[in-house]
């Protein structure tokens, strides 16, 4: 951009500013020439109860616990609680009724801080409580930011939850928890949220809750599925799990430690963990279903560790490395995960993921091959418009050994690999043909041929 272009823009901005100042000057009182613009009292919920109207200071020094309690005390009435920009130091958070809404001005400007070992926000048997545009910072080594038990359809939108776990202070804060979902809590949604620096970011022992367009950073364990009662599950979409390279910061981004329910991951990014995903336990069990689609996985040691899972499914997953040395992209225990599906997995650490990584019971489709344990029902190969083979059997060098032609005829390309028949006494014979076209047989013995 030329200086002339910049000057023209500056002139335009100056002209617009002067034009905008005219009506303001006309409205100003002549006896208050120093009056500056003052932001009106604005919120998207005009009926909200502003905590500063009930004595909250919001300077990060004063204890605002009692003021928040007064603001939230509405009896049987509906509650919309508003925390304007500020830093509110508390030791407890008030109880909230069903359908309450708690609003701030932004996750980094309306900040609630708590330095005690407590569960700060605790909801039990409540419905559709909403939190939006708030920040919560916990510094108690065994504290929990949010706990929901037997709650339904609660939501967190643009909320920042932050603990105190760092590599430098490990393991002091590994007991800190960001969110705990327990009981029969369901339908909880975390949208555009940040959950950072906890011992465990999210602990869930219940099914059917959702994390969307959010980020979990530098938690020792990002998400823990626990309970071992076939119940824990979670759906994550457009989520980032990130951390640094220090092994004390993050050990797992997702860990499922026993018998659980459905886990669904779509468009999820993982980087900066020893083992990015550790799924199941050989002695305790694992998910009834685990699915990953369109994900990127990087790790220091193992990308995806499938230890126990009834029905794992991975599609369009790319594996990468965090350090200079390549990790194990995917590790599958043949006892705990004998069956599963893997489609279009690629790796930047190798030319391709070897089919031998997966147990024989898996269906694996890669960019140039397919493995499946069996086909059920009638298998159909249909001839195309040309005379191309319907089927080919190739050797490791990709040379054709046998084929089914477009006409349906069988073709063997090797004289020593003709049709093998078994007689009524259990002996095997190979059909042969002489250069003159005379048919014959060659005995192969009673042991089933393998080559």
Predicted regions, residues:
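N-terminal export signals
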Residues: 2-4, 10-31
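C-terminal trimerization/auto-chaperone modules of long, extracellular attachment fibers and adhesins
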Residues: 27-43, 363-432
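Acidic Gly/Asp/Thr-rich repetitive segments characteristic of extracellular carbohydrate-active
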Residues: 51-82
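Short, T/G/N/S-enriched strand-turn elements that build extracellular solenoid repeat scaffolds
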Residues: 69-74, 89-97, 225-226, 279-281, ...
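N-terminal extracellular ligand-recognition/capping segment immediately after the signal peptide
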Residues: 73-101, 105-117, 134-140
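All-beta strand scaffolds that present successive hydrophobic residues in beta-strands
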Residues: 83, 101-105, 129-133, 154-157, ...
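Parallel beta-helix/beta-solenoid
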Residues: 101-106, 121-167, 191
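Extracellular beta-strand/beta-solenoid scaffold signature
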Residues: 113-122, 138-148, 168-182, 194-206, ...
